[in-house]
């Protein structure tokens, strides 16, 4: 019989020291009274890996692989025909409304996203994907595609780019066509596209070797930003946008792992607060209550809500088993006969062995006893995971299914949540810690692997991430105590710490600008926020000279950028309120150089190395952003068949009119960074008269396909590559003009927004 949910005032609540009902593992009949770490997040892996086993038995699987780690379990890809159909496809244009932070924020016209049949015959050619979608959707060759279907395909193409398989091979997501009907129905109603991700159960219990504690940290923060960015990227091609729903499986597994329900609650509530505080409006959450069709009742206080949750947690687990248990399912038989289940089981054994190591070391003296206990837990998790997957399928069938585990992509898309090597799922936030390196790299690692090379950083008294040990982060020797806050997807904010009513913020005169400059090479943009005297011109120029050699403008050292009010063709778009194209500073700055061998004199482009800003006044909230696109991240997410090596050979030209009237040719698309040697983008976005009253810019790819221009434009605005930076009055900002491209969004006429800028080398 299904337990009836109780009113919180009448609920009998079980606490961590009291006996609990457990159907599977007698060894966890009583919860430890002082559990300080939450148990492993196998949960989210477990929730999905064994799903739909009954439907999967008919598939031909590849031979079993070696045991895999918790982050590297593969579903074997089903055989598929990757050859291209010979179907001729007419051009299809998808209307693309502008998002609030798109440079065309004030434009009234939609920008077309066009799929064209260029006869490339490759999986990377979008027209091939459209062919497959047309055939699946309409069932006949040459049948027309509706505007709603075209929009749905554009949405799914955005989701596809987050897939690990797509990153590895550049091939189409197998499940794309199967989700077209689902997305089309939402597009017809002009609803946000809905995605669901079973994940975020609770932290691994192994705080000795893997994680930093039981609460969300920088790993979860990055993951939520990443998921919200996926939705924002969808909003660039479909105005209603998208939402991703996190369905936590914490309550599905925590009892068999000995994790208190209270630990699951605290972790989940902290995630929700994080999403609200960071204004990640597209990240939403589904409780197990709702998945089992019990409404989550709004309660007057946090304590009342917690009591209600704890009172019904065990009831929900029983109901999940009662409604979705497959009585015919034999976990042992499935492990022996089904490849997916076997791989999942091996993965569980792998990470359970490490996650439970501190407990096993004290509870079991023999390796054999430890192995038997872990195997029992793994089998139980497979059973629970199958139930949870069935509940999701039954109650959220109209959601696009995301996964944190590798799969062939037929029914879900495998994505990574935190920065990883290209094409690798890597560790989840609840199985790892984040390491921030001095070169700007963010890595998901096990804590034991970086404790010697990195220092532990706290936020609000909580261990939050590891930061590489470097003099660049030691400002105490300069007489300052500061906090370093990594931004997503790039950038760093530095704030003074130890400030109160009796200790005012330090002046910028004390800032170690040589360290700021070095940090900006890998961590641009570097923002100095909360310091005094940022708007004193003489002091501002002095700090610029400490950064490097100042490169004056023709009119002086400082360019003060604000809306000049001009609207004629010869006005400078920089001193307007218009959005601007993505670019680097110094496009039109040339110097004559003499070849030491031939004596030939050439005009050579000499852009400044760095920019130094301060902000006297801001635009209204939600406008006037400065966007910074990272070359490092651009090449990380560059989709196949495009490669760094291919782009390094590309040259391009531009034809400008108006204020910037000039024709430039033979410009390299990629240049090496003068310090790191890493490839960096040199680009100016095409900008026609529909986007501006001022100078237009036509761009030509000189020695490769013109399609590359659209690829570059799209990726430089991708939320995985581009930081949308919102200014605060008094901010100082240093950006590496080689490593970063930048632009701004539009803002209201007569707005007081003003930035000062100095170039230096």
Curated annotation (Swiss-Prot):
Identify the stretch annotated as signal peptide in this record. Answer: none
Gene disruption phenotype: Abolishes the production of xanthocillin derivatives including a dimethoxyl formyl xanthocillin derivative, the sulfated formyl xanthocillin derivative fumiformamide, a 1,2-diformylamido derivative named melanocin E, and the imidazole-containing melanocin F.
> Which pathway is this protein assigned to?
Secondary metabolite biosynthesis
The answer to whether UniProt assigns keyword Oxidoreductase to this entry is yes
Q: Where is the composition biased (Polar residues)?
A: 93-102
Bias-annotated ranges (Basic and acidic residues): 115-126
This entry's Gene Ontology molecular function terms read: oxidoreductase activity
The protein's superkingdom reads Eukaryota
Asked whether the UniProt record includes Phosphoprotein among its keywords, one would answer no
Q: Where is this region: Disordered?
A: 24-128
Question: What EC number(s) does its UniProt record assign?
Answer: 1.-.-.-
Alphabetically sorted, this entry's keywords are: Oxidoreductase
Described function? Isocyanide synthase; part of the gene cluster that mediates the biosynthesis of the isocyanide xanthocillin and its derivatives. The first step of the pathway consists in the conversion of tyrosine into a vinyl-isonitrile intermediate by the isocyanide synthase xanB. Subsequent oxidative dimerization of this intermediate to form xanthocillin may involve the cytochrome P450 monooxygenase xanG, whose expression is coregulated with that of XanB.
Family of the protein in this entry: Belongs to the isocyanide synthase family.
UniProt name for this protein: Isocyanide synthase xanB
């Amino acid at each position: 019989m299904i337990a009836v949910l109780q009113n919180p005032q009448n609920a009998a609540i079980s606490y961590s020291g009291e006996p609990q009902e457990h159907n599977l593992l007698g060894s966890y009949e009583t919860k430890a009274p002082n559990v300080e770490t939450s148990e492993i997040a196998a949960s989210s892996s477990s929730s999905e890996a064994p799903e739909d086993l009954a439907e999967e038995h008919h598939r031909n699987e590849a031979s079993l692989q070696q045991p895999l780690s918790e982050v590297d379990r593969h579903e074997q890809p089903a055989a598929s025909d990757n050859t291209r159909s010979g179907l001729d496809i007419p051009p299809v244009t998808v209307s693309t409304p502008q998002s609030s932070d798109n440079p065309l924020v004030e434009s009234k016209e939609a920008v077309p996203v066009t799929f064209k049949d260029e006869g490339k015959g490759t999986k990377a050619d979008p027209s091939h994907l459209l062919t497959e979608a047309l055939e699946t959707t309409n069932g006949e060759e040459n049948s027309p595609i509706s505007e709603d279907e075209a929009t749905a395909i554009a949405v799914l193409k955005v989701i596809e780019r987050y897939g690990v398989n797509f990153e590895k091979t550049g091939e189409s997501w197998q499940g794309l066509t199967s989700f077209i009907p689902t997305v089309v129905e939402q597009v017809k109603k002009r609803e946000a596209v809905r995605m669901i991700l079973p994940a975020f159960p609770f932290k691994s219990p192994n705080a000795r070797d893997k994680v930093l504690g039981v609460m969300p940290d920088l790993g979860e923060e990055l993951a939520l930003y990443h998921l919200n960015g996926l939705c924002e990227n969808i909003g660039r091609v479909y105005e209603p946008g998208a939402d991703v729903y996190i369905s936590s499986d914490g309550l599905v597994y925590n009892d068999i792992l000995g994790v208190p329900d209270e630990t699951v609650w605290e972790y989940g509530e902290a995630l929700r607060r994080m999403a609200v505080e960071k204004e990640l409006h597209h990240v939403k959450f589904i409780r197990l209550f709702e998945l089992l069709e019990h409404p989550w009742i709004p309660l007057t206080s946090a304590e009342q809500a917690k009591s209600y949750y704890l009172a019904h947690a065990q009831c929900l687990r029983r109901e999940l088993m009662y409604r979705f248990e497959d009585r015919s399912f034999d976990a042992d038989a499935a492990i022996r006969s089904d490849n997916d289940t076997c791989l999942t089981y091996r993965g569980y054994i792998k990470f359970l062995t490490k996650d439970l190591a501190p407990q096993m070391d004290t509870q079991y003296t023999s390796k054999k006893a430890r192995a038997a206990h872990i195997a029992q837990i793994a089998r139980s998790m497979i059973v629970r995971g199958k139930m949870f997957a069935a509940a999701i399928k039954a109650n959220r069938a109209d959601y696009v299914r995301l996964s944190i585990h590798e799969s062939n992509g037929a029914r879900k898309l495998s994505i990574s949540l935190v920065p990883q090597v290209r094409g690798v799922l890597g560790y989840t936030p609840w199985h790892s810690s984040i390491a921030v390196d001095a070169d700007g790299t963010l890595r998901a690692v096990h804590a034991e692997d970086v404790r010697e090379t990195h220092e532990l950083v706290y936020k609000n008294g909580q261990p939050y991430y590891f930061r590489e040990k470097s003099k660049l982060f030691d400002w105490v020797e300069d007489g300052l105590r500061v906090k370093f806050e990594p931004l997503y997807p790039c950038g760093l904010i530095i704030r003074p710490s130890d400030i109160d009513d009796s200790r005012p913020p330090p002046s910028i005169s004390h800032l170690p600008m040589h360290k700021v400059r070095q940090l900006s090479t890998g961590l641009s943009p570097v923002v100095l926020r909360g310091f005094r005297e940022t708007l004193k011109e003489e002091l501002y120029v002095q700090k610029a000279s400490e950064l490097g050699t100042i490169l004056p403008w023709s009119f002086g050292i400082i360019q003060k950028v604000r809306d000049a009010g001009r609207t004629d063709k010869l006005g400078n778009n920089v001193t307007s309120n218009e959005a601007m194209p993505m670019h680097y500073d110094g496009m039109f700055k040339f110097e004559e150089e003499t070849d030491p061998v031939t004596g030939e004199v050439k005009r050579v482009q000499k852009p400044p190395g760095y920019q130094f800003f301060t902000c006297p006044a801001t635009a209204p909230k939600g406008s006037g952003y400065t966007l910074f696109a990272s070359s490092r991240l651009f090449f990380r997410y560059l989709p196949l068949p495009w490669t760094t090596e291919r782009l390094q050979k590309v040259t391009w030209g531009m034809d400008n009119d108006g204020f910037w009237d000039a024709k430039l040719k033979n410009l390299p698309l990629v240049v090496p960074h003068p310090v790191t040697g890493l490839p960096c983008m040199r680009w100016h976005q095409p900008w026609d008269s529909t986007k501006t009253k001022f100078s237009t810019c036509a761009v030509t790819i000189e020695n490769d396909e013109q399609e590359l221009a659209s690829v570059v434009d799209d990726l430089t605005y991708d939320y995985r590559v581009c930081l949308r930076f919102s200014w605060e009055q008094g901010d100082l900002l240093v950006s590496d003009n080689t490593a970063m491209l930048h632009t701004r969004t539009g803002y209201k006429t007569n707005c007081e927004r003003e930035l000062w800028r100095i170039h230096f080398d």
